[in-house]
């Protein structure tokens, strides 16, 4: 599982207050909705521009330990209500799902929403969303996490799992491929 470093709650409280003061003083209306993480405020979150470049990988981002302030703000102010905001969408429809964009707008606080997804994953046939799922009368499927039964999992980032799944399906009934 992911282990996030912690620091003193007092410094987190001070940093969070500074963030709100700066946002209220300098951000034009609606900016928080359009771009929750501006490049000018990356330093506050412990992030650097290199963390958000085109080749950033989700695993490397978590290993760098840049989310320590965010994790402490969650623990200190919200009582584990909102765990993290670094989603990894599995298809195009999930980017606009309640767990991503809608939740970000409806929450009473602002926190960076960092979305990792490769372009090739969004173009993959298995990741496509049909228009039938977006018609009037449909709704988003909710996902509830039962953290009391959390277990360590293996994580395959980027398009690795789709590539491996396709390789498995191509060779599932071809016994000669397994003899090699």
Curated annotation (Swiss-Prot):
Swiss-Prot/TrEMBL cofactor(s): thiamine diphosphate; Mg(2+)
E.C. number(s) listed in UniProt: 1.2.4.2
The protein's enzyme class: oxidoreductase
Family membership: Belongs to the alpha-ketoglutarate dehydrogenase family.
Gene label: OGDH
Function in brief: 2-oxoglutarate dehydrogenase (E1) component of the 2-oxoglutarate dehydrogenase complex (OGDHC), which mediates the decarboxylation of alpha-ketoglutarate. The 2-oxoglutarate dehydrogenase complex catalyzes the overall conversion of 2-oxoglutarate to succinyl-CoA and CO(2). The 2-oxoglutarate dehydrogenase complex is mainly active in the mitochondrion. A fraction of the 2-oxoglutarate dehydrogenase complex also localizes in the nucleus and is required for lysine succinylation of histones: associates with KAT2A on chromatin and provides succinyl-CoA to histone succinyltransferase KAT2A.
Primary residence: mitochondrion
UniProt source species: Mesocricetus auratus
Protein name: 2-oxoglutarate dehydrogenase, mitochondrial
């Amino acid at each position: 599982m992911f282990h996030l470093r912690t620091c003193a709650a007092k410094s987190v409280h001070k940093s969070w207050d500074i963030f709100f003061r700066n946002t209220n003083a300098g951000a034009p209306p609606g900016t928080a909705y359009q771009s929750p993480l501006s490049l000018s405020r990356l330093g506050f979150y412990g992030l650097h521009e290199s963390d958000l470049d085109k080749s950033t990988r989700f695993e490397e981002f978590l290993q760098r330990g840049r989310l320590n302030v965010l994790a402490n703000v969650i623990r200190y102010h919200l009582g584990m209500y909102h765990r993290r905001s670094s989603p990894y969408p599995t298809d195009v429809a999930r980017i606009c799902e309640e767990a991503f964009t809608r939740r970000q707008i409806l929450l009473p606080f602002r926190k960076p929403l960092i979305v990792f997804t490769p372009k090739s994953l969004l173009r993959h046939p298995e990741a496509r969303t049909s228009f039938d799922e977006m018609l009037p009368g449909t709704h988003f499927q909710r996902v509830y996490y039962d953290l009391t039964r959390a277990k360590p999992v293996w994580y395959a980032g980027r398009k690795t799992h789709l590539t491996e799944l396709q390789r498995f399906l191509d060779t599932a009934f071809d016994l000669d491929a397994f003899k090699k």
